């Protein structure tokens, strides 16, 4: 019985330390977005022009910074696609992933249909201070509510989106 209590205490300490470390890493890697209201509209690869402020006005917007060459993004992109199909407000920004035709061909081959902006030269990524892909940024009413970099689960992102909508 004493041994079980010791293990439970050590597990609880480990979970608290892991959560604190994860939160600290998110704060350290947190992007510094530009002033959303001053951003020009951006153009999707399909030619549609969108405003981030307008997209996040009614419900939270998940901005997914990713790249076709990113190994972790190959795991997270299908999850983002599921969220998009579930009705989550998603906009993706593909950083340095080739020309529009190549990007769209690659997305079609993987069954990815979420809206995408092609950031061929990495200017948007730099403007948003994106240091790693994938990075998930959640905007609500033009304000950044949450961000995280690296792998995240579908439920982790859904929870962040739910929290942003409160």
Each predicted region: which residue ranges?
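Structural microenvironment flanking redox-active thiols in thiol-disulfide oxidoreductases
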Residues: 74-110, 120-126
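Short, Lys/Arg-rich N-terminal segment immediately upstream of the first membrane anchor
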Residues: 1-7
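Hydrophobic membrane-insertion alpha-helices, especially the h-region
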Residues: 8-24
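Short active-site neighborhood of thiol/selenol oxidoreductases, capturing the structured segment around
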Residues: 51-74
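Thiol/disulfide oxidoreductase modules built on the thioredoxin-like
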Residues: 108-112, 120-166
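N-terminal "domain-start" segment that seeds a small globular fold
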Residues: 21-53
